[in-house]
Amino acid sequence: MLNIMEVHETNQMIEQEKLDVRTITMGISLLDCASDDVDKTCDNIYRKITTYAKDLVSTGKAIERDYGIPIVNKRITVTPISLVGASSCKTSEDFVKIAHALDKAAKEVGVDLIGGYSALVSKSMTPAEELLIRSLPQALSETDIVCSSVNVGSTKTGIDMNAVELLGHIIKDVAERTADNDSYGCVKFVAFCNVPDDNPFMAGGFHGVTEGDAVINVGVSGPGVVSRALDAAKGKDFEFLCETIKRTAFKITRVGQLVAQEASRRLGIPFGIIDLSLAPTPAVGDSVGEVLEKIGLEQVGAPGTTAALAMLNDQVKKGGIMASSYVGGLSGAFIPVSEDKNMIDAASSDCLTIEKLEAMTCVCSVGLDMIAIPGDTSASTISGLIADEAAIGMVNQKTTAVRVIPVAGKGVGEMANFGGLMGYAPIMPVNQTSCEAFVTRGGRIPAPIHSFKN
């Protein structure tokens, strides 16, 4: 039974502590849109998206109005396009046509982003998958809200180093093509290991082939709420601290569950999952970094940061999992540098380095996320960063990812501005010692011994 204090507490979370639902994401299967003609495939895709998602934005706004819960983004994910376009796309330009169809359909229904211009190549690349990857510079520079991801490895299959090596060059090319906008195209691309099928967050979201025809997935956000709750834990022991985070995560997730079920009911589309992730914004008081500092660090990046993040991540999961009937996606704590005020400050003061961020990715939701690096960073160095993160994910049986932005024409100490939720970031130094002989060997890194479970 709810009591009036709990109602007041929820209102306070929304009004003062920046609690919001980060995204309602509709996943749509496009497998039935495939044909042997690329123009027909584009027409099928446009028609299906605009039919299924026509009421998504208006429904999100209605739920916002009825419940007083801010819903920041409405998004769409689709089946990986390398699968949908495999029969009809004979060139990279054919895949770019599909990217334009996605962009047009997403704008027509009014969503903020559409994800799924993706390829799953954890073991090897088909010709169609390689064509899609090679189309990324043109596709991401010519479209506005299309997001892309490539899964380069998994615990079961190992790491496809051919794809990893290729992506270093692709990311550099995307950066050059969008140089006039601080290489913004790279913001819309992420390389994964162990990618989930039901991620509502961008840029890594797509509608997995194991999913049904359509689904509603919701991502919540609440680092500001956790931060405020931790004011009461100052000077207390770890038991009290963990209990505080856990209880707060439960309340945050319960709001997401309500929104997800209501959106599912109103749209007539099944509810999929709640992603428990604490997703920061560049606004003051909405920072995962601030939470870590309230746990007891002088600044993010100090010794103890990885342990504090591990504890935070675990308690968020323990609290959130009780609040939702289905939990999925990435679910934990995000550490995107450009989207988190306290992490921006820590990176600017050199307290937070890429090497420390890599250590933090061993215990949190994702990986090296929204990190601006010098524009003259070599393709092989970027491939090396992707390989390192993929190895962490592969060996530890967790999702890891890399979203780095080699900002064309800028160097260490300068600032890159991506705008809106994507924020801004100082250009961080990268170890430039060459790994080219390693990443260009060709082939794949085998799966680890503990992957053999049968």
UniProtKB/Swiss-Prot annotation:
Pfam families: DUF711. Disulfide bonds: none annotated. SUPFAM superfamilies: PFL-like glycyl radical enzymes (SSF51998). Belongs to the UPF0210 family. Homodimer. This is UPF0210 protein BL1209.
